[in-house]
Regions:
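Conserved nucleotide-binding/hydrolysis micro-motifs of P-loop NTPases
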Residues: 1, 34-37, 58-60, 81-85, ...
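Structured core elements
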Residues: 2-3, 28-31, 36-39, 52-55, ...
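Conserved interdomain hinge at the start of the Helicase C-terminal
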Residues: 2-28
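Short, well-ordered alpha-helical packing segments
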Residues: 14-21, 38-45, 51, 63-70, ...
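Conserved motor-coupling elements within RecA-like helicase/translocase cores
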Residues: 17-24, 34-108
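C-terminal helicase module of SF1/SF2 nucleic-acid helicases/translocases
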Residues: 101-218
């Protein structure tokens, strides 16, 4: 779902989390940074939604927190890099069958993405947190034209598209053109990052050659 402004998106994110949380369905909220995770934590605190924040500031319990993300009433806000390699069990890490059955009836784990990230691979990893190994689950991404990725690439074009489609304030839209534009933006970032890594490796090779010459002359 894409909105015009960050504020409109934030209202939609918190509303969705509130609605899902009332049912008891577990929720895992993905953000792009520590600042963003704390931003959404503040919004949920104002709504009285109990939750945990998992980021680099409290990573000691990372594996335990992520492993229990599938428990009833669980709401966890995390950054995109947290909990890699940790399986999320519906009903919690103890895998009690009755608890798992309850969570399945509620719809499994609900993954909420608060923006599209710079890498399609990371986006897919976030989506893949729900519906693992045949379990039921759902994922939804909330975007705005003021997101970092959108501001850097393609927001003017998308703004024009949204205007032509008659999008009103507070309304959201999904459209194949928007999806393609986002994927192109991510490809540009991935290509840029790849070029940077190649340059760094090239400089490393030069430095290593210089070190060898210095050692040989000693």
């Amino acid at each position: 779902l894409i909105f015009r402004t960050q504020n409109e998106k934030d209202l939609a994110v918190t509303k969705r989390i509130e609605e899902v949380h009332k049912t008891g369905q577990p929720i895992l909220v993905f953000t792009s940074s520590i600042n963003k995770s704390e931003h959404y934590s503040d919004l949920l605190n104002k709504k009285g939604v109990k939750h945990l924040v998992l980021n680099a500031k409290n990573h000691e319990r990372e594996a335990e927190i992520i492993a229990n993300a599938g428990k009833k009433n669980s709401v966890i806000i995390t950054t995109s890099i947290s909990g890699r390699g940790v399986d999320i069990k519906l009903g919690g890490k103890n895998e009690i069958n009755d608890d798992k059955t309850v969570i399945k009836k509620l719809g499994g784990l609900c993954v909420v993405g608060t923006e599209r990230l710079e890498s399609r691979r990371v986006d897919n990893q976030a989506r893949g947190r729900s519906g693992r190994q045949g379990d039921i689950g759902e994922s939804i991404f909330f975007l705005s034209l003021e997101d970092d990725l959108m501001r850097i690439f393609g927001s003017k074009t998308l703004e024009s598209v949204l205007g032509k489609l008659g999008l009103k304030e507070g309304e959201a839209i999904t459209h194949s053109l928007i999806t393609r534009s986002l994927e192109r933006a991510q490809q540009k970032v991935e290509s840029h990052n790849y070029d940077l890594r190649k340059q760094i490796l090239r400089f490393d090779d030069i430095l290593n050659d210089q070190r060898k010459i210095i050692y040989q002359n000693r």
